[in-house]
């Protein structure tokens, strides 16, 4: 072999090697807003020489539609909430987890970790990740007196000044106003036909006050920033975003209490990157990452060891000083046996003139 052939061969090998190094595996996520922020995802990408690509969902129904509509294979990791996590596990849409690959799993809150939501047939299908309420948010410069009830949204002087989530959570909220969470809050997720009709009537009465229904956190943040709304049902994510912008926002849980969620991380059954996905789950439930996620979202972490990295003020803001007491004020989402009927009622509310 002559010198020219050797040089050309070495050049070809070098080019091939360079191409391999440039090509990165992509881990695809379908998660709630804020769960793939570069501030904490970038370190995982660098360590594992991969790219994390995220699509955000606006509701649990959107997640279920995508998983059941043939696009499940497009995603490796999902973040279902407590209302659909069990359904996903039962339907075989998630892969069982090898807990030996998740050493931080045992650091998670026992109350969250031992929930039956993501357990089926002796297997664990998801890890608790973040939790929180759907609180009442209001602009302190636009609302003179602090509201203490969800019923404040129906006040006549708030015509065209409120926003609600385009989600079944608004159905639950109206049911609370009507007292259907008494004596058992679980009844919110299994309302009768008569109760759902009463909820529909109550929400149609609310429509003159609704400036816009929001579907993403950024949308509600903008509505407040532009002073289009004065009060809304929201997420702690919006409170966190608006406070960082210096906006005079306040968050509270009304006297009726509120609904809320426990978000989990799951690996889809169709994922072709299950090993990398498991490494991602471990990274996301480590104490240091949990702290970074709370910095972005304002949500409460599933790993209580993350509080060792927080100031006292941060712990108090996230209600990690006494999480059990705070959880008692949150009626965490449950499976809704008649979800199709709930959605039918909600769609009728939206269509009503």
Q: Language-model segments: what does each one mean?
A:
Residues 21-88, 221:
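Early extracytoplasmic/lumenal segment of secretory-pathway proteins
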Residues 135-142, 177, 262-273, 292:
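A bilobed periplasmic-binding-protein/Venus flytrap-type ligand-binding module shared by bacterial periplasmic
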Residues 323-353:
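Conserved C-terminal helix/tail region of periplasmic/extracytoplasmic solute-binding proteins
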